[in-house]
Regions:
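Hydrophobic anchor at the beta1->P-loop junction of P-loop NTPases
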Residues: 5
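P-loop (Walker A) phosphate-binding loop of NTP-binding proteins
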Residues: 8
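Conserved glycine(s) of the Walker
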Residues: 11-12
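Conserved substrate/cofactor phosphate-moiety recognition/catalytic segment
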Residues: 18-81, 101-104
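Conserved nucleotide-binding/hydrolysis micro-motifs of P-loop NTPases
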Residues: 39-41, 95-97, 141-147, 193-194
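Glycine-rich phosphate-binding loop used to anchor ATP phosphates in small-molecule kinases
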Residues: 58-132
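NTP-dependent small-molecule kinase module
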Residues: 153-250
Length: 250
């Protein structure tokens, strides 16, 4: 299952990514080898980000030219051929995060600037489509008041967005999801508890599950059932037959 999660900071993309990973393990018996989330400057390293406060401060002092290059090279790296060797991939933000935050907060990638991020986004997506058309964009939304409360209750270290910009950022994500060449898209509202969001996800992703996904779901269900039968002393019809045989002996 190949997913790109995109949405305003504090909408809950990271939380949802890990919930989907757990759901995939429950349903398919498989997990994502890595969850790639490297595009919210200065959190651009590791799985998850492992940069120190000093390293983050250094990156925040970098020039727009350096930030642009740093992020663009990361985007290109994450769509190289071996990325698509297996059936699964999870990206949080990716080129959509970069196209929102680069021009809005870091001074690069806007219209008329070198490496306009709308154009770079399509370059990245054409590369993805060269290898697979299975990628699904999951547009993660949340009410503005909810995002505002999350910002106050649990602020991110070196977070990006400003409270006054929440609606503008949300609108830009909506525009760029619509702009995307990746044709498979769903939207989930993560304003409430994650279990409700996952219920939306499970319903909406169903039509985009690949043959591999469906095969793994079926196989995992069969294996889980067999394990349950072993623990219970066999399948129900054998247990029932055994009880009848015991009764006939008397």
């Amino acid at each position: 299952m190949r997913l790109l999660l995109a949405g305003c900071e504090y909408a809950g993309t990271t939380t949802l990514a890990h919930a989907i990973d757990d759901w995939m393990f429950e349903k398919m018996g498989a997990r994502y080898s890595l969850i790639h989330e490297h595009w919210k400057i200065p959190h651009t390293s590791g799985h998850p980000d492992d940069t120190t406060p000093d390293e983050q401060a250094w990156l925040l002092r970098a020039t727009p030219k350096f930030m642009e290059m740093h992020q663009r090279h990361s985007l290109y790296y994450h769509v190289q051929a071996n990325t698509f060797n297996g059936p699964d991939g999870m990206v949080v933000g990716g080129h959509i995060d970069d196209a929102v935050y680069g021009p809005m907060y870091f001074g690069y990638g806007g219209k008329g600037q070198p490496h306009d991020r709308e154009l770079v986004a399509h370059q990245v997506e054409r590369t993805i489509l060269h290898f697979t058309n299975d990628t699904v964009i999951v547009h993660v939304t949340a009410d503005t008041d909810v995002i505002r409360k999350r910002m106050k209750d649990d602020p991110h270290e070196n977070g990006i967005i400003k409270e006054a910009d929440i609606d503008k950022v949300k609108t830009r994500f909506e525009e760029l999801v619509a702009w995307s060449l990746l044709g498979k898209k769903i939207e989930v509202d993560n304003s409430g508890v994650i279990s409700d969001t996952m219920a939306q996800f499970e319903q909406k992703i169903e039509s985009y599950l690949t043959d591999t996904d469906r095969s793994r779901i079926t196989t995992h269900m069969m294996l889980a059932r067999q394990q349950r039968w072993r623990e219970e002393g066999g399948p129900p019809w054998r247990r029932h037959r055994g009880r009848r045989d015991d009764h006939s002996d008397h």
